[in-house]
Amino acid sequence: MSISITLHRSGTSRTQQVDTTTTGLDLFGSDRAVVAMRVDGNLVDLQRELHDGAEVEPVEATSEDGLNIIRHSATHVMAQAVQQLYPEVNLGIGPFITDGFYYDFGNIEPVTPEVLSELEKRMKRIVKENQRFVRRVTTEESAREELADQPYKLELIGTKGKGAEGASVEVGGGELTIYDNVRRNGEVAWKDLCRGPHVPSTKYLANTFALTKFSAAYWKGDQANDQLQRIYGTAWASREGLAAYQQRIKEAERRDHRKLGAELDLFSFPEEIGPGLVVFHPKGAMLRHLIEEHVIARHMEAGFNFVHTPEITKGGLFHTSGHLPYYADTMFPPMLVDEERDEEGNVTRAGQEYYLKAMNCPMHNLIFRSRGRSYRELPLRFFEMGHDYRYEKSGVVHGLTRMRGFAQDDSHTYCTREQAPGEIKKQIEFFLSILADFGLNDFYLELSTRESDSAKKEKFIGSDEDWQVATDTLDQVCRSTGLQLVPDPGGAAFYGPKVSVQVRDAIGRTWQMSTIQYDFNQPERFDLEYAAADGTHQRPIMLHSAKLGSVERFIGVLTEHYAGAFPVWLSPVQVRLVPVAEAFNDYVTGFAEVLGSRGIRVETDLSSDRFGKKIRNASKDKVPFILIAGGEDAEAGAVSFRLRDGSQVNGVVLDEAVRIIAAWDSRHRNDDPTAETLRGVVDD
């Protein structure tokens, strides 16, 4: 007796007859590159028996689904190893995440690097046992009995995917299932509440995983719940995939902006000031100034009106905008101002609550509303380097990329509904051109919309009709750009959908940069209007946008993108003059004055260090032009260029040297000068 299935693979389809007991392992078992399968579009284990008429497609280990399955299987192996080492541990959840996985544990002693090493050894032994992952459907009653000593699992049973972030890997789906890890002799080595799917056996994980770090966590992500310990790992489709990832991590560590910020004397985060707040040193402040100066100039060229607003405001403004109460958790607590009391302490004059500014849009609305507006003024674009403050939990602040105090290149455009599509497209093109100015050219778009679940719509304001119009407008504009568009359901701001530009840096990591949001709510809340051509008063549409995201975050990303070796036009110090000996100090000092008078950022190293050390120091500081002067140079009125790649161009007369450096600065090139390209830029 047989059944008919259709196998889809590598772009081809083939219908074939197979036995009624045929599983995915029978079809793909000899191919270790296949870790699971899709049956009628659903991800399932290879051990699953097929049904008549099934549409079957293999899941390759290197695919996104395949890697997620490998990583989730690795979490089970890790949790088994943890439970071997700590039998009384309470198991939390263990989902896959980008590039890896984690598992949360309660009732466990503090994890250390030595513990991670021991756990990896145990995981390798488990993998060597070639334990099978066996799916078992159970009832809620049976599951509670089996997992009676696991309080977090008991809490998850019956939730069917609701509750903790990542819990869907435990109990999502239509059935309650447990996965057993079964040894060759049939003995169950370990089990976990899980919906799967998993790789067929632990041998599929051989030489593909590593444990990476540990941290504190809270059950269900809520600080009111138990504190747990989270262990992270990574897993890949092959030994080579793991090695490549580990190399990327090493490169990312080398480029870490926090490390480079200290080494290059750009910025610091003094404990005396507090987490999430940065101090820019002279070189870092110059880098910041250069970025802001360029962005401001580009906005002026594009028809934006420069404005400025204060950094504190009465709380009522944020109630009008709707940020209170929707945004309250991410704002600093209010300050009570102007309260007066008599000698007995009785309040004689009520104070008012003031807030640090968390966003600029409410104040820009007040500028729009300050006088009557005509349709002839639209689109009206306001732009500000606004300084904002948001209360990020101390555990999530991260260098310059997640801060409590930051500056936004923030703009708000007021336009008619008819103008909105064209204005959005124009601004997206503007975003991309600014990012390209800084050497960021690899990007895609992400469209963030509100939750479709009616129960979760409460955190969003506005009518369904307005949301649909706004979302459709952004979607259509994004598609017209020809760029890749990735959906982000639930990621919208409370007042409207958002498009963000996701940028890939020099080592392939993705960063959110520019954003534009369609807002139909704030014009209503602030009673904004303009006089239309027919004499009626109409509500404008409001477009929020930021090109860099935040200046600080952009500096962090740019520092890592260039590994601290900024292009000539952005380098805080463009030239360092190094005399071969003390006898040439006056010569290089005089030339430094010439360069400085041309606006070139120059330093001289007149220290008592030996010449070789001076060169090493300049290279370590990533100065793009090291100019060396010795006897022959001084006699010829010249200098020698030493460049970042180690190449050298000797005997460049001073006038030509000035022209070369000035040209590299003014042309805003983002590549490094080489011996071959050094002079060519003058003739571009």
UniProtKB/Swiss-Prot annotation:
Protein name, as recorded: Threonine--tRNA ligase
HAMAP family membership: Thr_tRNA_synth
NCBIfam families: thrS
Key word RNA-binding present: yes
Catalytic activity annotation: tRNA(Thr) + L-threonine + ATP = L-threonyl-tRNA(Thr) + AMP + diphosphate + H(+)
Cell location: Cytoplasm
Segments passing through the bilayer: none
Binding partners and assembly: Homodimer.
Gene this chain is encoded by: thrS
Region ranges (Catalytic): 256-567
EC annotation from Swiss-Prot or TrEMBL: 6.1.1.3
InterPro entries referenced in this protein's UniProt entry, alphabetically: aa-tRNA-synt_IIb (IPR002314), aa-tRNA-synth_II (IPR006195), aa-tRNA-synth_II/BPL/LPL (IPR045864), Anticodon-bd (IPR004154), Anticodon-bd_dom_sf (IPR036621), TGS (IPR004095), Thr-tRNA-ligase_IIa (IPR002320), Thr/Ala-tRNA-synth_IIc_edit (IPR018163)
Keyword Transferase in annotation: no
UniProt-listed GO biological process terms: threonyl-tRNA aminoacylation
Primary enzyme class: ligase
Organism, scientific name: Cutibacterium acnes (strain DSM 16379 / KPA171202) (Propionibacterium acnes)
Cofactor(s) required for function per UniProt: Zn(2+)
Any Gene Ontology CC annotation: cytoplasm
Biological function: Catalyzes the attachment of threonine to tRNA(Thr) in a two-step reaction: L-threonine is first activated by ATP to form Thr-AMP and then transferred to the acceptor end of tRNA(Thr). Also edits incorrectly charged L-seryl-tRNA(Thr).
Binding site for Zn(2+): C361, H412, H544
PANTHER family, sorted: THREONINE--TRNA LIGASE, CHLOROPLASTIC_MITOCHONDRIAL 2, THREONINE-TRNA LIGASE
Keywords, alphabetical: Aminoacyl-tRNA synthetase, ATP-binding, Cytoplasm, Ligase, Metal-binding, Nucleotide-binding, Protein biosynthesis, RNA-binding, tRNA-binding, Zinc
Molecular function via GO: ATP binding; metal ion binding; threonine-tRNA ligase activity; tRNA binding
UniProt domain TGS: residue ranges: 1-60
CDD domains named in the record: TGS_ThrRS (cd01667), ThrRS_anticodon (cd00860), ThrRS_core (cd00771)
Cofactor remark: Binds 1 zinc ion per subunit.
